[in-house]
Amino acid sequence: MDSLILERLLAPTHLGAQISRQMKLDGALLLSARPEDIDASGYLSDLVGVTLIWSEPIGAPTRAVMKISHAGFGQPELPFYESIASHLNCNVIPEFYAGGVDETTGRTWLLMEDLSSTHERPSDEPLPPTFSRNASIVEALAKFHAAGWNRNDWHDVGPTLWDRLRSSDWLEEACHCLFAQAGDALDDRDRDAYARFLRGFPVLIERADRMQGRTLIHGDAHVWNWMLPRNGIAHSPKLIDWDGWHLGVGVWDLAYMMATQWDRDVRQRFEIPLLERYHAALIDAGVTAYSREALQNDYRLAVLLHMRTPIARFARNMSAFVWWPQLTRIQHAVEDLQCLDLLD
């Protein structure tokens, strides 16, 4: 962590002014903001604990975590917290205290609630969490999706799933490059499946445009982006790292979580029961006119469209440790759920 950027961002006058934009301080002044090491590592960001001392006990945070994104990353997360999260009234989203852009480096920074004493990771990546922990995650995800379900005020709120799908002119060439690199590690069945997918992709985009339940989605809601309450602590699960948020459909997050991240055996055992729990949680949260059958149909379409995901990882020059397992997992899910039948 660059000590100079911390010195700038944690200057009491500067940080206190930023916090005052998000909450009433009733004249209290921030006297000091002291950085501390925390047992957490950021992906494409630096994380540091912060102890805050105020002139008066007004209920302002005394412990927080500062996230400073690496240059060129994390920009969408700030407008999400500043303009979107406050309108959702959803406790799945961590509390946001302040944020901005460091003028010297252009790096985006956020000051958020410290979850270290109340929450923990659901498991050590890549070990899948237990079923009960996964159930807590999908129920909390449903709560978040329900908070933004079919709201009329999301028009022009930001990027959309359909915009991203339509901006896929790179897809076919990237497939050919990946297949050439993989060689005979990819069998003919996989290649044929992708050939069918590419031919039908324009039609799939139009079908996706008719999917039910438009809402805000996280975009990277794998289980290790969740923090679950520690045993004996009554808190909601928390979903972190919001730089991939956009308008879409809830099943997109679900399919990404299960079909691209879990090996076949785990997904086959957990998938249907977790979809049941997700649907029940949607209904409990007030969502209407969305049947379990409709959820299943939308989920299958989302899984099929996620054949694009490992190709996108490859096209962005991400490690084969990321895209190769995802390629295998999504092919298994497409086969198990007979998703290619949607192209007939």
Where are these regions (language model features)?
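Conserved NTP-binding catalytic cores of kinases and kinase-like/nucleotidyltransferase enzymes
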Residues: M1-R107, P229-P237
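Regulatory N- and C-terminal appendages and interdomain linkers associated
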Residues: M1-S41, S55-P61, L204, M211, ...
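Active-site acidic catalytic loop and adjacent metal/ATP-binding pocket
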Residues: D39-P57, F201-G250
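Active-site activation/catalytic loop segments of kinase-like enzymes and analogous catalytic loops
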Residues: P79, G244-G286, V303-P325
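Surface-exposed helix-capping loop/turn segments at secondary-structure junctions
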Residues: C90-N91, G148-V157, L282-S291
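Short pocket-lining segment of the protein kinase catalytic domain that shapes the ATP-binding cleft
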Residues: L110-S117
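ATP-dependent phospho-/nucleotidyl transfer catalytic cores
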Residues: H119-H218, M227-G232, Q326-R329, A333-L343
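Glycine- and acidic
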Residues: P122-L127, I240, M258-R264
